[in-house]
Regions:
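Flexible glycine-rich surface loops and low-complexity tracts that mediate binding to linear polymers
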Residues: 91-113
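Short acidic/polar inter-strand loop motif in beta-rich domains
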Residues: 108-111, 220, 228-236
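C-terminal motif of bacterial Sec signal peptides marking the signal peptidase cleavage site
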Residues: 35-38
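Structural detector for short beta-strands of small beta-barrel domains
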Residues: 43-67
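Beta-strand/loop nucleic-acid-binding surfaces
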Residues: 77-92
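Short helix-loop boundary/capping segments
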Residues: 142-195
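Short, solvent-exposed, Trp/other aromatic-anchored flexible loops in extracytoplasmic proteins
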Residues: 95, 194-222
Length: 238
């Protein structure tokens, strides 16, 4: 029997743009370093100093009242203060935290120099019946892994995109929670289903995008994730 909650406002999907650059880079030298990193699997001499290697991490970026990024905390739980605070066009809200991906130089155990920072789209698992629509257009799946903190489940996607005009249309995504089951011993398992609308976007080329799933405060012991891909439904258990 339903409990009456069906009368609450239906949920919409989250928009994600895949052709527009969302990374903020800080210097030409940093950009060249970033390009070198992306083209080389083992770019650096392992004999270099402990803090000389550029690193890349998913993080929570803390922004102050002036929309300046001051600190970030990685998925491994390490917190750093930026040697030089910065802002960016995509930082639109003051006094908040952004889910981000960051390339940085570790200056000390508590400080870091930002090289390139961008936003990561975050979705929450929502009961399936709360969505206005539940599209499952195929999407490329690359990887899924749990953040060490246990707060996020990160998913790597390959999204097909293109343009038929100057207008840039977004893909629409969401995460439907189909079931939550509690075993007699108290363990909990949740089944999540990835929602995706191609939104009529031409499929001319492929872009890699990452999405973070913000897990409930009381986290399931086991997560079953299903994604409709071009090769059929992929099931991942984490």
């Amino acid at each position: 029997m339903f409990d009456g909650m069906l009368h609450s406002a239906p949920c919409a999907l989250t928009k994600i743009r895949v052709t527009k650059r969302s990374m903020t880079r800080f210097t030409v030298q940093s950009l060249l370093t970033l390009l070198l990193l992306s083209c080389t699997t083992d770019s650096y001499d392992k004999g270099e100093g402990k803090y000389s290697l550029m690193q890349a991490d998913f993080c929570e970026l803390t922004v102050d009242g002036q929309k300046q990024a001051l600190t970030f905390t990685t998925d491994d739980g390490d917190t750093y203060q930026f040697t030089t605070p910065f802002t960016a066009k995509w930082i639109e809200t003051a006094d908040t935290t952004y889910r981000s991906v960051i390339y940085y130089n570790k200056v000390s155990t508590t400080q870091a120099e930002a090289v390139s920072v961008g936003t990561v789209v975050t979705v929450n698992p929502i009961e399936h019946w709360r969505f206005k629509e539940q599209p499952q257009d195929p999407i490329g799946f690359e990887s899924a892994w749990m953040a060490k903190s246990g707060k996020y489940l990160n998913v790597g996607l390959l999204m097909k995109t293109g343009r038929i005009s100057d207008e840039e249309l977004p893909h629409n995504i969401g995460l439907a929670q189909d079931t939550v089951y509690t075993y007699p011993d108290g363990r909990c398992a949740a089944s999540y289903r990835f929602l995706h609308s191609q939104n009529g976007i031409p499929q001319y080329y492929t872009n890699r995008r990452y999405v973070s799933i913000l897990l409930p405060t009381v986290k399931p012991d086991t997560i079953h994730l299903s994604i409709q891909t071009y090769d059929g439904i992929v099931h991942k258990t984490l």
